[in-house]
Regions:
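Cofactor-binding loop segments of dinucleotide-utilizing enzymes, especially the Rossmann-like FAD-
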Residues: 8, 42
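Hydrophobic anchor at the start of a short beta-strand
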Residues: 35-37, 84
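A short, Lys/Arg-enriched amphipathic alpha-helix followed by its capping loop at the start of a domain
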Residues: 25-35
Length: 96
């Protein structure tokens, strides 16, 4: 089985509530059961540099909206056997 887990937060990268605990632990447990899990979340500005420096840039692209040409980047970090993909966009995720 393949699972793409989308979340707004995950431990240890960023935490504001209980969702981060689940998003940080559930994928690890599913992997132990043989599930192929990938986690996708925003690349918030407040994610610690110790994690950011280990991320690999996968791609970047632009989305044309009515009023602007919007950048989005995709970064990857394998952490504790889980592949995390971070979506970079300063306008939406450049906050703490």
């Amino acid at each position: 089985m393949n699972v793409l887990y989308l979340t707004s937060e995950a431990v240890p990268f960023i935490k504001t509530g209980g969702l981060a605990d689940v998003a940080g632990s559930l994928p690890k447990e599913l992997i132990k059961d043989g599930v192929d899990v990938r986690v996708v979340m925003p690349l918030y500005a407040s994610i610690d540099e110790s994690y950011r420096s280990k991320m690999e840039k996968i791609t970047e692209f632009y989305v044309d909206l009515d009023w602007k040409h919007q950048y989005a980047g995709v970064y990857k970090l394998d952490y504790q056997e889980v592949s995390f993909y971070f979506i970079d966009n300063l306008e939406y995720f450049g906050r703490d």
